[in-house]
């Protein structure tokens, strides 16, 4: 059996059935990330996935595929996994997973649409920022324009996706400008939900070394809150989008809908 050391999932999926698809991260180069630094990437054998499903509750209605980037397994393998879920969990109405801009580039619109038809209905995509300089500094492996292109592919394939954004990622004195660039990206992406996280410098990461060397200065609490406020102010929402800052790393807790709660959120951030 494959050894799955660390399992991460969005807090909104805490009551969802978890299905291991991979262990570790196939990229594992983001400067700020400590989640899979000491883990070798491996894909869970299909036989083990099928056994897990056979032992599960056939009345399961929702599944979350675990692993840093399950779509990195490729189209054919993902299609087989979804067909197995449909076989053993016939009442499952939604399969969700994390995804990266890098892995999405491997898929055509037609392939994404086919995965959607087989039950993959929701992706949590770590966009982090719309600032190309920051993306390069943090070694995300993509540009803002590439992120927008992949978001458009998802929309064309009828795939719902949530955008994960990280404030404080640009560093001291750069937060407001970062918010404006990120809002510009989000305005084109049009995700169903925007989930924010606060940059945390974890020991053992490349970012921790950069801080120690004086090559990255962390933003203070007040500046980070200004970044959240600026992000909300610059979001030009054509359709309703959920805005959620309730992840454990966040400095403030906001949850609701834009544009109707924009002023309410801004007032809370100004208190």
Language-model features and meaning:
Residues 65, 122, 145-207, 221-245:
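Conserved C-terminal portion of the radical SAM core fold
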Residues 41-44, 48, 73, 77, ...:
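Alpha-helix N-cap and loop-to-helix initiation/capping positions
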Residues 3-48:
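Canonical Radical SAM [4Fe-4S] cluster-binding loop centered on the CxxxCxxC motif
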Residues 207-271:
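C-terminal accessory regions of radical SAM enzymes
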Residues 25, 33, 49, 65, ...:
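Conserved, mostly hydrophobic/aromatic
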Residues 38, 68-70, 98-102, 128-132, ...:
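Active-site beta-loop-alpha junctions enriched in small/polar residues
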Residues 56-157:
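Conserved SAM/AdoMet-binding glycine-rich loop
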Residues 45-61:
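Short microdomains enriched in Cys/His and/or Lys/Arg
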């Amino acid at each position: 059996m494959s050894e799955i050391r660390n399992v991460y999932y969005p807090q909104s999926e805490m009551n969802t059935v978890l299905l291991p698809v991979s262990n570790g991260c196939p990229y594992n180069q983001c400067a700020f990330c400590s989640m899979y630094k000491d883990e070798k990437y491996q894909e869970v054998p299909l036989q083990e996935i099928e056994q897990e499903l056979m032992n599960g509750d056939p009345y399961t209605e929702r599944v979350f595929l675990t692993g840093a980037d399950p779509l990195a397994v490729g189209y054919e393998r993902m299609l087989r996994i979804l067909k197995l879920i449909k076989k053993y969990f016939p009442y499952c109405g939604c399969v969700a997973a994390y995804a990266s801009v890098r892995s999405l580039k491997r898929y055509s619109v037609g392939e994404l649409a086919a995965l959607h038809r087989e039950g993959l209905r929701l992706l949590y995509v770590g966009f982090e920022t719309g600032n190309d300089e920051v993306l390069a500094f943090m070694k995300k492996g993509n540009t803002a324009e590439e992120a927008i292109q992949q978001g458009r592919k998802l929309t064309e394939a009828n795939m719902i996706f949530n955008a994960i954004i990280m404030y404080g990622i640009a560093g001291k004195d750069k937060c407001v400008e970062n918010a404006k660039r990120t809002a510009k990206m989000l305005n084109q992406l049009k995700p169903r939900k925007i989930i924010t996280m606060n940059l945390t410098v974890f020991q053992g990461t490349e970012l921790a070394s950069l801080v120690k060397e004086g090559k990255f200065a962390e933003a203070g609490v007040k500046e980070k809150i200004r970044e959240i406020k600026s992000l909300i102010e610059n979001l030009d929402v054509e359709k309703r989008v959920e805005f959620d800052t309730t992840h454990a790393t966040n400095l403030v807790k906001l949850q609701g809908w834009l544009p109707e709660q924009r002023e309410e959120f801004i007032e809370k951030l100004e208190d």
